[in-house]
Structure formats: structure tokens, C-alpha cells
Design a protein with these regions (language model features):
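N-terminal secretory signal peptides that target proteins for export/translocation
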Residues: 1-15
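Bacterial N-terminal signal peptides
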Residues: 18-32
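Bacterial Sec-dependent signal peptides at the C-terminal "C-region" and cleavage site
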Residues: 31-39
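Disulfide-stabilized, aromatic/cysteine-rich ligand-recognition loop
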Residues: 38, 42, 46, 210-212, ...
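A short glycine-rich, aromatic-capped structural motif
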Residues: 41-112, 126-133, 137-140, 220-221
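Residues embedded in well-ordered beta-strands
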Residues: 49, 182, 225, 283-287
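Functional-site microenvironments in short loops/helix caps that host divalent-cation chemistry
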Residues: 57, 61-72, 118, 123, ...
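Residue-level detector of short, conserved catalytic/binding motifs and their immediate flanks
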Residues: 81, 86-88, 181, 214, ...
Length: 291
């Protein structure tokens, strides 16, 4: 499957499997095998961080951020928009090779062999959009069945909440803290706060970022993260977050990757790929949301 990308209002472009990081015209695209495990241990269980309800800033333009791409602009009239989101939770780190390996061992899911052929603590890559959603469904079921699930999370699951991918808006609120910051930690690029312009991913959560919104790690760089939003021009519409479009949409990815330039790891930068894309620079993290 080929990853497709635009940058602004430019030409359609393609990338083959040998290409692992680039930006074309506003939309940018971008170990040893694990022992079998049947369900998450405490170490593999995600740490969910509450992202409180309230307003958020979404989008950017060159007036406020000279690095912004055209597809980040909210509308012809304004560079940024404001949304109000209810409470949701996001995992503190990206899903690791170890955690994804537990899912594969428990379910017999057909994973790309390269997804598990990496250090256990690294963020899993070579996962498609359906792969990520399948992991979410398995994780939800195992958390419901586990006596070790945090009481707050267990209660939400009993109340009908689900484990899934974050929407594009949820991801951006978590990355920006609801304000105008360009990066999860502020407005200035910092190589000590994110893994970008480098040769390979690092362990999920390895790079501490005490200034980052909500204490989340790797919201900039390391691997692009799938969302459950199909790519659409702004202004953002939550009604477009339809998880049944697997064959018909480009799906938004956020955060940039280890081999991307700093421009692509800004909190408002938007990437997208076809749902079947499995690449060395695409991973995900999980969300807990009300149905």
C-alpha cells in the first residue's frame, strides 16, 4: 500500500515503502522477537491520563506560526479555531512493541513481522490503521476482564466507555494543552524534549518532558500516531470521525516521526495515510472515550 500526501493546495504525490520521512505540498506524510503473552501485565497496561473537559485551540497559520502549512489554517477568515471537548483519556506513552506483541500472541492477529522485530520498549511501528483499531478492541476487552485495571478506568468501562484511537481534535488538545503553543512544551524547538531529525526511534517515554502538556511523552517525534479522523479540510467537524471508512479515506496521523524535520513535529502539523499503510515511522497511542 502506498502512502499518499499533499502539502497545501499542491499536487498529489506518492511514497513507496523505501521512503520513510518527507513533506510534500500542506498535508505531510509522512530487537528480538517477543515471548508470547496472553494479556497485559501491569507493565504493559497503558497509563491513561485525563484530559479535562473544556475549550481548545486547533489549527494554525503563518501569521502566528511561520512554519504552518496551508492545511492547518482553520478557515479563510481565521487561522485558528476553538472547540469544546468533553473529558477523555489518552495513554501517557505510545503503544510499545511489547504491548502489541501481547495482543498478537493472545489473538493470533496477523501482524507485519517487522512490527515485532524491534526492542520491546520502542513504540510499535509497521502497524496499519485496522491493526491499531484491532489492538484497541482487544485492550478494551482485557481491561474489562482484569482485576488490575485502575478503579477509575474500570468504572468508565462499566459505564460504556471504549478504548479506541483519539480523534484529531483530541490528539491536538492533548499535545497543546488547549492553548496556542507550537510544540507540546512551548513555542521553541528543543531536541532534548523530542526525538526528531534522528536515525531511529527511541524507547517510548525515554525522553522526559516535564513541560509537555498533561505530562504526555513523545507527542512530538518518535513515530507518527494514527487517529480515528479521516482527513478533511478544516474547519474540523466531529461528525467526520467515522470509523467505518476503512477503504475510502486517508486517515489523519499526528506528531511527526524520528526522521522528520522540526516543522513536522509541531502540535498542529497534519499528516495522513491510506489505512493499510505499514511503515517504519507510523505507530499509535490509545484513548479512552465516552461512547
Amino acid at each position: 500500500m502506498i502512502v499518499r500526501a499533499w502539502v497545501g493546495a499542491g499536487r498529489l504525490a506518492t511514497r513507496g515503502p523505501d521512503l520513510v520521512g518527507s513533506c510534500l505540498l500542506g498535508l505531510c506524510l509522512v530487537g528480538a522477537p517477543l515471548a508470547a503473552q496472553t494479556q497485559p501485565t501491569a507493565k504493559l497496561r497503558p497509563e491513561f491520563v485525563a484530559i479535562g473537559p473544556g475549550p481548545m485551540t486547533m489549527g494554525a497559520d503563518a501569521t502566528r506560526d511561520p512554519q504552518a502549512f496551508d492545511n492547518e489554517r482553520w478557515s479563510a477568515a481565521q487561522g485558528e479555531g476553538t472547540l469544546d471537548l468533553p473529558l477523555f483519556y489518552l495513554s501517557r506513552t505510545e503503544v510499545t512493541v511489547a504491548a502489541f506483541g501481547a495482543f498478537v500472541a493472545a489473538t493470533g492477529a496477523k501482524a507485519d513481522p517487522r512490527a515485532l522485530d524491534a526492542p520491546a520498549a520502542q513504540p510499535v511501528a509497521f502497524v496499519s490503521w485496522p491493526d491499531a483499531l484491532a489492538y484497541c478492541r482487544w485492550l478494551e476487552a482485557t481491561l474489562k476482564a482484569s482485576s488490575g485495571t485502575a478503579p477509575e478506568i474500570a468504572q468508565h468501562l462499566r459505564d460504556g466507555w471504549r478504548v479506541t484511537l483519539p480523534t484529531e481534535a483530541q490528539w491536538e488538545k492533548a499535545a497543546r494543552g488547549g492553548d496556542h503553543r507550537r510544540y507540546p512544551w512551548g513555542d521553541t524547538p528543543r531536541r532534548d524534549r523530542a526525538n526528531y531529525e534522528s536515525a531511529a526511534p527511541v524507547a517510548a517515554g525515554q525522553i522526559a518532558c516535564p513541560e509537555c502538556a498533561y505530562g504526555l511523552t513523545d507527542m512530538a517525534g518518535n513515530v507518527w500516531e494514527w487517529t480515528r479522523s479521516p482527513y478533511q479540510p478544516y474547519p474540523y467537524d466531529e461528525a467526520d470521525d467515522r470509523s467505518g471508512l476503512e477503504a475510502d479515506a486517508l486517515w489523519v496521523m499526528r506528531g511527526g516521526a524520528f526522521n522528520d524535520p522540526v516543522r513536522l513535529v509541531r502540535a498542529s502539523a497534519r499528516g495522513a495515510a491510506e489505512p493499510g499503510a505499514r511503515r517504519a515511522f507510523i505507530g499509535f497511542r490509545v484513548a479512552l472515550v465516552a461512547r
